[in-house]
Regions:
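ATP-hydrolysis module of ASCE/P-loop NTPase motor domains
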Residues: 31, 51, 92-99, 117-187, ...
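Conserved Walker A/P-loop ATP-binding site and its immediately adjacent core
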Residues: 54-71, 103-107
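Walker A/P-loop NTP-binding motif
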Residues: 33-49, 419-420
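Conserved ATP-driven helicase/translocase motor core recognized via long
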Residues: 53, 172-362
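Conserved helix-turn-beta segment of the N-terminal RecA-like "Helicase ATP-binding" lobe
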Residues: 64-96, 117
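Walker A/P-loop
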Residues: 18-37
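Conserved helicase NTPase motor core
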Residues: 4-8, 13-14, 19-23, 50, ...
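Inter-Walker segment of RecA-like/P-loop motor cores
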Residues: 86-108, 360-370
Length: 432
């Protein structure tokens, strides 16, 4: 029995020649829609596409394997109904070598085909987790021993202030955490430098001129817009025929609060924002008996309202716990330790990279960054697609990514540079 798609799903399946991001809740059939889109392109009666002209990426081998099986089953069924169809016969052959893969699998493909462009030994292997963990531990141990032996005053102060008791294990964990965070960025060393820059205050301008402070208000604006959208959604439900109309009073008061916060954000009034968020007070929903009201809609409104309230509470707990003066003092006090942490992290990254080169092994992060180095030419702040990127871009009719919400910036740039974006075509399809 054929699947009956909704109007929205049908649109997503059939739209062509544009970049598309499908955002929907878990369990809503996003992956099924992606598979159907692939099938619709392969079986298009007017302009069918060979499956090896599609780059299909997801985040686990299991998911990639399941997707390949789904496509193969559908092709098998179509071929059973039309056994003389040469195009379908060809797809059944191509399915086994089609690029239905994980992101790291695609990176490996790029490196295998273009390793000579970055001077990489083609005899490399991918290290397993256990081996990498032991290697990291050895490098960290050697790193800290060297710093202790040098007697660096800044390092000694850093350890005395931030180590837990007599153990420096927590500091080693901080180095690893910062290293991992940096490696999810296209240019890790630049990102680490930016972390330090955020804490280097100009005495005359103070914290308000830092990139971090300006970015903070962008985060606040986005969060408040989301809270406002949730509030409006809840009010719309209250206005339905079986909606809890008596909840509107509390929701309208919530909206007044959100708009008050938006005004403070527009003025970048940090201290008043602290005062408001640290003293949040929400009106109680009406407890009066409501005739003819859907219990399901009441629960839905309550849940949506709680989500909006959580956004406001989260802003207060994350970003607005002290005055601007105190924040400035904390930032200045944190600058020295952060510089040392970044220095340790950079040193660790270099030593870890050297050890992996010695053993001729790569980890998944290496593969992403080597693939990026192959696909992107960077000169100063200007990045342009390489010849390899242009070749791969011509190879793919469409680039499809499942579970887009799990991708990082490195992976997004990789996807962009093998897509039609390189030559002004729109052919990226993402679900998440």
């Amino acid at each position: 029995m054929a699947v009956k798609w909704t109007e929205e799903q049908e649109k997503v399946i059939t739209l062509r020649d544009r970049n598309i991001l499908v955002s929907a809740a878990a369990g809503s059939g996003k992956t099924a829609v992606l598979v159907q889109r692939i099938l619709s392109k392969i079986m298009d009666s007017v302009k069918p596409v060979d499956i090896d002209r599609l780059l299909i990426m997801t985040f686990t081998r299991a998911a990639a394997g399941e997707m390949r099986e789904r496509i193969e089953r559908a092709l098998d069924q179509a071929l059973a109904e039309d056994p003389d169809n040469e195009h379908l016969q060809r797809q059944m052959t191509l399915i086994h070598t089609a690029q239905i893969t994980t992101i790291d699998g695609f990176c490996s493909y790029v490196i295998r085909n273009y390793f000579h462009l970055i001077g990489l030994d083609p005899g490399y292997r991918t290290a397993d987790e256990g081996e990498l963990k032991l290697l990291q531990e050895d490098v960290l141990k050697e790193l800290f021993e060297d710093y202790y032996a040098e007697g660096d005053e800044d390092f000694t102060t850093f350890v005395e202030c931030y180590a837990a008791g007599k153990s420096d294990e927590s500091l080693k964990e901080h180095v690893l955490d910062l290293y991992d965070a940096s490696m999810s960025n296209p240019w890790p060393e630049e990102w680490l430098d930016g972390c330090v820059e955020n804490y280097c205050l100009d005495p005359e301008k103070g914290i308000v001129e830092t990139k971090w402070y300006q970015s903070l208000w962008e985060i606040v604006d986005s969060a408040l817009k989301e809270a406002e959208e949730l509030n409006r959604s809840a009010m719309e439900i209250c206005g339905e025929s079986e909606g809890p109309e008596l909840y509107l009073d509390a929701l309208q008061k919530d909206l007044v609060l959100i708009r008050q916060l938006q005004e403070l954000s527009d003025k970048q009034d940090y201290d008043q924002m602290v005062q408001t968020l640290q003293n949040l007070s929400f009106a109680r929903l009406s407890t009066k008996k409501m005739e003819g009201v859907s219990g399901q809609l009441k629960s839905l409104v309550k849940d949506i309202r709680e989500d909006a309230k959580d956004i406001l509470k989260d802003l207060g707990s994350r970003y607005f716990q002290c005055s601007l003066e105190e924040l400035t003092e904390l930032t200045l006090a944190s600058a020295g330790p952060l510089k040392m942490l970044v220095k340790l992290t950079k040193d660790f990254a270099q030593r870890f990279s050297d050890k992996k080169r010695e053993k001729n092994v790569l980890d998944f992060s290496d593969m992403e960054h080597f693939a990026l180095e192959i696909l992107l030419k960077k000169e100063g702040d200007i990045c342009t697609p390489s010849q390899a990127a242009r070749e791969l871009s011509e190879k793919y009719d469409e680039v499809l990514l499942d579970e887009y919400q799990d991708s990082n910036l490195v992976q997004e740039i990789l996807m962009q540079n093998v897509s039609g974006w390189v030559n002004d075509r729109k052919n990226i399809f993402m679900v998440g």
